Amino acid sequence: MPSAKQEEDLLVVARPEGLYCPPGDFYIDPWRPVARAVITHAHSDHARPGHAHYLAHVDSAGTLRARLGRDIPLQTLPYGEAIEHHGVRVSLHPAGHVLGSAQVRLEHGGRVWVASGDYKTEPDGTCPPFEPVPCDTFITESTFGLPIYRWPAQAVLFAQIDAWWRANAEAGRASVLFCYAFGKAQRILHGVDASIGPIVVHGAVEPLNAVYRAAGVALPPTLRADDADVDAALLKRALVLAPPSAQGSPWMRRFGNYADAFASGWMQLRGTRRRRGVDRGFVMSDHADWPGLQQAIAGTGAERVFVTHGSVQVMVRWLGENGLDAQAFRTEYGDEDDQETSRGSGSGQTACDADAGSPHPDLPPAGEGEAP
């Protein structure tokens, strides 16, 4: 734990409970129960149960209440509106990660810090795009903080998914696409060509679709697999969105001779598709890729950067080589984007974070890889 003098010099410090703002006496995305928590978004590694008070963006209310309970003590803010707590001015700004995701801007004593949470720099239409917020100190993730990670453009990605779905529909087999139920599933729904066929979703996905629709995000009509209208003929033309936990489960038997695929940033790596046991892999992430991380950090104008999780040491070294004061915060954030990095961690940290920011265990030699 930092000394009192160190805490005086920092607006955010790492404590056993989470990232703590000493002058404001509150935490940002704490992983242990605290009195006051500012939540950047509703993924379970950032929004934990048990806090006495939550502050989040208004569009996170639906997902937070769905995941943590209808009666959680939740205060919400729109983007850009500031409140003051113990002399710290706090405001939330778009992070572009999932619905309601926010960067937390802190202003106190002439200093400005921004804690970004998780973010993505390419707009996807399901949430306001990432907004660079000028600051002195920026706290960044680094989930995909290696030069190998470069995402295809949104239009290219969905052309690939549509072509795969269309070919399967013409062959009379369902297209099962495994993806995370919150964020990625809705992004896929928003981006695919719904004229190709019906869209069926797992029961874990549909409640979150309702939250997105209530927030005004345009999603095509969806059916649940157990709806009366869903029969064998319909399924032969359908796109089916399901969480990774459904793979190999009895729930999958209803689809007969189906084609399957997995949507994840980890599909950039050699061997991931094979290990997942699917026919196709689509390189898709709700986190920034390597160029996106560089763009976001540069856009803040910050002279000091703290890196929280992912390829921490690689990012810290690169930032230092480029003239910034770069340090690491050790955290317990996981990776909602995919569970590939959490094998054996056991603490909610990614394997990268648990190993002090070492590259993904499946990273090919010399940083080379291939998209499946």
Where are these predicted regions, by residue range?
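Active-site metal-binding loops of divalent metal-dependent hydrolases
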Residues: A42, D59, V98, G117-Y119, ...
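Short hydrophobic/aromatic-enriched beta-strand-loop microsegments
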Residues: V58, P73-P78, I196-G203, G323-E332
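Short internal beta-strands
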Residues: H53-A61, I139, G197-L208, F262
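Glycine-biased, low-complexity coil/linker segments
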Residues: G367-G369
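His/Asp/Glu-rich metal-coordinating catalytic cores
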Residues: A4-R32, R36, A42-V176, G183, ...
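A short, well-structured beta->alpha microelement
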Residues: D9-D29, A214-A238, A242-W251
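C-terminal regulatory/interaction regions
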Residues: P2-K5, A194, A225-D355, P372
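Hard-cation-handling environments
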Residues: F158-R237, L241
